[in-house]
Structure formats: structure tokens, C-alpha cells
């Protein structure tokens, strides 16, 4: 997140709207129900499905719910604290999804440490592709290494994201309108969803997520 804005006492923000609170509370409760009720009801024979439901529930419970409520608490005190997720499915391009709406904390770090120092030397597209490659390696460290399998698949996933964003920014992509509207949204979802099993591969779901769910008595 933007620590400078967070610590700047001169930047005061208005209190969040009640509907924003309701959204954060709803997503927290829904995530908890999916994690401790729905996932448990899935037969043990469908372990991979169990793990996927539990993993999505954790993302909803934490990233979209609890972390959002924490940000709202700070905002109610006048502090400029942004939620790390900003309605990512409203994006109409990969660039908007990864750059403005998904996991803004990681986006801030990668922008400060990689993109800003290198984009003038390498160009925006090449530096953006490099950011995706580095993101893939980091996700391999936190996903594949603990799972002891699936090495390289998260990196390939993020390289594909960089490839998709390069296509969006190309003349061909602009001519087809891939960075906007319904067509842009569909193009984005193909790149995000079709290869997502390379990011959260079975080794991770079965070897990390399921044991974690048992540890928190979700199974």
C-alpha cells in the first residue's frame, strides 16, 4: 500500500459510505460460510474441489472482507487507507485488473521497486513484462516451494499475463478493442481464468490448502 499517503496527516478522507461497510461485512460472512460450511459438505472424494472452494473462501474472507473492513476503520478516522482489492471483476482489461484493482499492496511494491526505476530505460511494455516475470518467480516461491511440486507453473501463468497485456497494447489489440468494453473483459477473463490451474496448481491445493483447512477446523 501507499505508506506515504497513509502516514501523511495532512491528507484526510471523508468517512466511508454505509453501503461500503455492508459490502465488506457481506463478503466476510460469505467467505466464512463457504469455508466452514460449504467446503465441509463436499465429499472427501472430491478433495481438489474441496480445496478450491476453501481457497476461494479464504480470499473472499480475508482479501475482500476482513482487510477491507480494516481499511474502512482507518478511513473512518480520516486516514487514507485503500483496500487492497478494488472490485477487480469490473476491469475491462488485463492492465486495469493487475495495475489498478487486484492486490494493490503488491502492485505498489512492484511499481516502486521494478517499474519506476526501469521503465524509462526499457520502455513501459518491456518493464511491465519484467514485472510479471518477477511476480511469477515470487509466486513460485510462496506456492510451489511449500507444496513441493508444480515448479514453474505460477511463473508461466504470469508470463502469460504479460503476454496478454502486450497484445492489449499492440496495434492489433487496440484495433480489436481488447482493452475496453465487453470485448476487453472477455479477453481479460480468458487470460485470467483459463490457465488459473497453473497458478493454483493441484500440488498447492492438495498439499497446502487442505492441510491448512484441517488446521483451522474447516474440514
Predicted regions and their residues:
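Intramembrane catalytic core of multi-pass membrane enzymes that act on lipidic substrates
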Residues: 1-77, 83-85, 91-92
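Transmembrane alpha-helical segments that form the membrane-embedded catalytic/substrate-channel core
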Residues: 2, 60-77, 109, 162, ...
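Residue-level signature of transmembrane alpha-helical entry/exit and packing/kink sites
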Residues: 24, 28, 51-55, 124-128, ...
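Hydrophobic alpha-helical cores of multi-pass transmembrane domains in eukaryotic membrane proteins
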Residues: 29-34, 133-137, 159-163, 190
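Hydrophobic core segments of alpha-helical transmembrane domains in multi-pass membrane proteins
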Residues: 52-60, 132, 154-161
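Membrane-interfacial catalytic/cofactor-binding modules of polytopic membrane enzymes
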Residues: 71-144, 176-219
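Interfacial helix-loop-helix junctions of multi-pass membrane proteins
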Residues: 143-155
Amino acid at each position: 500500500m501507499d505508506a506515504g499517503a497513509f502516514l501523511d496527516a495532512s491528507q484526510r478522507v471523508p468517512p466511508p459510505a454505509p453501503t461500503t461497510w455492508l459490502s465488506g461485512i457481506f463478503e466476510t460472512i460469505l467467505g466464512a460460510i463457504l469455508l466452514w460450511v460449504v467446503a465441509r459438505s463436499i465429499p472427501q472424494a472430491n478433495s481438489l474441489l474441496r480445496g478450491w472452494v476453501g481457497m476461494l473462501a479464504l480470499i473472499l474472507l480475508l482479501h475482500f472482507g476482513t482487510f477491507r473492513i480494516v481499511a474502512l476503520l482507518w478511513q473512518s478516522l480520516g486516514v487514507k487507507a485503500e483496500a487492497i482489492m478494488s472490485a477487480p471483476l469490473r476491469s475491462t482489461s488485463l492492465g486495469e485488473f493487475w495495475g489498478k484493482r487486484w492486490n494493490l499492496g503488491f502492485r505498489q511494491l512492484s511499481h516502486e521497486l521494478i517499474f519506476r526505476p526501469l521503465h524509462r530505460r526499457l520502455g513501459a511494455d518491456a518493464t511491465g513484462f519484467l514485472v510479471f516475470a518477477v511476480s511469477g518467480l515470487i509466486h513460485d516461491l510462496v506456492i510451489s516451494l511449500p507444496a513441493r511440486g508444480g515448479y514453474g507453473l505460477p511463473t508461466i501463468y504470469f508470463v502469460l499475463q504479460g503476454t496478454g497485456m502486450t497484445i492489449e497494447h499492440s496495434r492489433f489489440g487496440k484495433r480489436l478493442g481488447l482493452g475496453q468494453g465487453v470485448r476487453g473483459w472477455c479477453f481479460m477473463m480468458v487470460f485470467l481464468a483459463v490457465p488459473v490451474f497453473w497458478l493454483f496448481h493441484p500440488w498447492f491445493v492438495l498439499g497446502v490448502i487442505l492441510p491448512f483447512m484441517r488446521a483451522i477446523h474447516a474440514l
